[in-house]
């Protein structure tokens, strides 16, 4: 059985071919911000991402019709529970509309899988979209009545890495208390406890550390002043997930380039690079407080964990909290494949997207 795994990110498209659970080939294609910002919105990137997938299959000598199941990373629709979800017309429509409010590249996995699946008449699935919602009530509240913090993170990799580390330690995931930091084109930091992601930075929502493509937490008055100078809300929205961070400072989302600039003595690049590390460490500290200081491990994952100075910068500030474990890159392709295989073998059940958010407000708001 052949599975095509489609995993679009803010700076790359990663595609894998699995056969009977075995990885046959994987390719990751980098997309710098100037290329992606040519598109008016994320939906406009579908042809580009589909081209990457088709070229990958061509290199493997496999036609789309030979694929048995198409699996895509998800996001953009209403928040749902964790697990495997069937990709159907309702999910695709809400994903296109970005009803969740976060227009992130992860949604393209569902849209590309849908294009392939409908073209070839094959089943399609997604797993742990970026907005699975398991937050504690306290994590939702803000200082403005009616505005709530959302669960918006690299949920697929967070859960895959947390579960892998739990297996490594011999404990069930539900009994572990982890802080996971996914560090790549976007950065999200979350607290895991009782088998749930109970709090997280809202990665593509202007919250938490800034990143190569994201603005992170910015003082609200500063944003108001920015808008008063003639900038638009659409510009700010783009900076939340596509045009902030390194892109705003340097016009590129290429971390290698910015790191090289910093190493070669560019003061601006050095300060911005170190500030990103500082902010990641600060968010880890916040999540340690969420877990009342009872933390089994801090798990660092994502593509930028390959940079030693990022790891050491976090270790120097957060090493007192808990042991720091490294999982460079991500485990998303394997997680997508094996979860869907468990469904196909009848070991787990896929759920159908409801078209309603899993959390829809507090009881006192539902008065008639």
Identify the role of each PLM range.
Residues 57-105, 123, 131-142:
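Short beta-strand-loop/turn "lid" adjacent to the catalytic site in phosphate-handling enzymes
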Residues 238-293:
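Adenine-nucleotide phosphate-binding core of ATP-dependent small-molecule kinases
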Residues 295-314:
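Glycine-rich phosphate-binding loops at beta-strand->alpha-helix junctions
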Residues 55-68, 168-172, 284-296:
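Phosphate/pyrophosphate-binding loops at sites that engage ATP/ADP/AMP, CoA/4′-phosphopantetheine
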Residues 3-44:
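Short glycine-rich, Thr/Ser-proximal phosphate-binding strand/loop in the N-terminal lobe
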Residues 107-115, 126, 133, 141, ...:
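Glycine-rich phosphate-binding loop plus the immediately following alpha-helix
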Residues 328-368:
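Structural signal for terminal/edge beta-strands and the immediately following C-terminal loop/tail
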Residues 308, 312-338:
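Conserved phosphate-binding/catalytic loops in two-lobed NTP-binding clefts
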């Amino acid at each position: 059985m052949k599975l095509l795994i489609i995993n679009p990110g803010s700076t790359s498209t990663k595609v894998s071919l699995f056969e009977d659970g075995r990885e046959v080939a994987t390719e990751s294609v980098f997309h710098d911000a100037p290329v992606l910002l040519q598109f008016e919105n994320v939906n406009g990137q579908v042809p580009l991402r589909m081209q990457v997938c088709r070229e990958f299959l061509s290199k493997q000598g496999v036609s789309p019709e030979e694929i048995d199941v198409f699996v895509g990373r998800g996001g953009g629709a209403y928040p749902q529970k964790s697990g495997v979800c069937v990709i159907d017309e309702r999910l695709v429509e809400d994903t296109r509309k970005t009803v969740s409010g976060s227009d992130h590249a992860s949604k393209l996995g569902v849209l590309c899988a849908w294009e392939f699946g409908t073209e070839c008449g094959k089943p399609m699935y997604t797993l742990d979209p970026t907005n699975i919602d398991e937050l504690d009530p306290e994590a939702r509240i803000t200082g403005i009545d009616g505005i709530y913090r959302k669960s918006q993170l690299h949920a697929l990799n967070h859960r895959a890495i947390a579960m892998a580390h739990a297996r490594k330690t011999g404990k069930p995931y539900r009994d572990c208390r982890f802080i996971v930091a996914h560090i790549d084109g976007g950065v999200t930091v979350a607290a895991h406890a009782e088998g749930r992601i109970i709090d997280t930075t809202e990665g593509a929502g202007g919250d938490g550390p800034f990143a190569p493509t994201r603005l992170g937490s910015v003082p609200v008055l500063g944003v108001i002043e920015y808008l008063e100078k003639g900038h638009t809300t659409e510009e700010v929205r783009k900076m939340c997930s596509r045009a902030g961070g390194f892109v705003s400072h340097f016009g590129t989302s290429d971390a290698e380039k910015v790191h090289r600039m910093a190493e070669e003595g560019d003061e601006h690049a050095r300060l911005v690079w170190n500030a990103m590390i500082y902010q990641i460490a600060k968010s880890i500290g916040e999540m340690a407080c969420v877990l009342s200081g009872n933390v089994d491990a801090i798990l660092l994952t994502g593509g930028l964990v390959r940079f030693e100075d990022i790891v050491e910068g976090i270790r120097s500030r957060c090493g007192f909290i808990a042991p720091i474990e490294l999982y460079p890159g991500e485990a998303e392709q394997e997680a997508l494949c094996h979860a869907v295989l468990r469904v196909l073998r009848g070991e787990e059940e896929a759920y159908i997207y409801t078209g309603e958010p899993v959390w829809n407000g507090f009881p006192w708001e539902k008065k008639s």
